[in-house]
C-alpha cells in the first residue's frame, strides 16, 4: 500500500496493535491507549485486511486505513499503517504470518526512529531499533507472536468495555457511542424528504430534526438565492452547479457532525436540483439552456452516486401552492407540479433509489407521524 509521510515514533520501546477496525471503536481504543502509555515510544497501529473482507463495500480496507489515520491525526504518539494481505501474497490465517511479518518489519523501519549510542568517536555511530511489544485480544495471535520471538500481551477487551465490531455492524444506532467519529458517517441512518415546491418539506424536516434531536439540513438553493438576490428564471448553469455542490457539502457536514447520534434528515439533494434544472431548461423564459442542463445533469448524477440514503420520503403534490414571494408562481399550477413530480420520480428510479422510496399522500400531520413511526422502528431495532 502507499503511505503518506508520518512523523516517526521515538523511544526505547513501542507498542503494536493490529486489527481490521471495521469499524474502529472504544474497545480498540482501550488497547491502543494502553499500548501508547505503557511504551515511551508510543504505539504503531496496523489496519489489516484484504479486498472483500468483513468491511464489505461500506468499509473497504483503504477507507478504514484513511479513517483510522484521521482519528489519530493529532496524536504524535500513534503511527497508523496498513497491510493488505492480498497485495503481499499472505495466505489466510494461520498460514500467512511469515509474509505478514516481513511486511510489518518494513513498516516498522519507517514508523520509528533509530536510537543512537553516544560515542566520543563521531566516526563510530552505533544505533539500535526500539523494542516492540504487541497487544492482542486473541490468545492464538499472542502465542504465534511469542513463538516468533516477539513480546506480546493478551488483553480481554470485552471485560471492561463489552463491545465488538460485529455488534456495531449489526446494530449501529444502539452502539452509537462506541463508534469513533470518522466511522459514524458510514453508519448514520440518512433520511431524505423530497418533493416539489410548497409541499411542506422544509417545515417537516425542521420539525422532525427538533423532535428527534437530530441534525437536519435546510434547502441550500433557497438560501443561495436570497444571498445572491436572484430569482428562479434568472438561474443559469453555474447557479445550479453551486446548488449541487452546496447541498452536498451541507448534508455531508451534518452527517459527520458530533450532533449526529445516528439519524439525519435532509430537506433536499442532487436529485431534486436536477428535477428543477431539467424542467426550467425547457422553459424559454428561464436563463438555463439545454446545453447547460447537460452539464448540470452530469454533475448531479455524479453527486447522487456518492450519496447514501437509507429511506426517502416522497411527498406527492397536493393542496394549495403558497405564494411566499420567493417561488416561481408561473409553475404553481397542479399540472406543472405534476410534471415536476414525474421528473423527480424518474430521477429516483434511474439513480437506483426507488426501492427506498415511501410516497406520502396525507396532510402535514399525517406525513409527520408516518415518518416518526418509521424512525422509532429504526431506533428500536
Per-region residue spans from a language model:
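Nucleotidyltransferase catalytic core that binds NTPs
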Residues: 1-189
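Conserved substrate/cofactor phosphate-moiety recognition/catalytic segment
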Residues: 210-252
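Hydrophobic positions on the alpha1 helix immediately C-terminal to the Walker A/P-loop
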Residues: 204, 208
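Hydrophobic anchor at the beta1->P-loop junction of P-loop NTPases
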Residues: 193
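Glycine-rich phosphate-binding loop used to anchor ATP phosphates in small-molecule kinases
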Residues: 242-307
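Conserved glycine(s) of the Walker
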Residues: 200
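The conserved Walker
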Residues: 197
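A glycine- and Lys/Arg-enriched "phosphate-lid" helix/loop adjacent to the NTP-binding pocket
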Residues: 280-351, 358-360
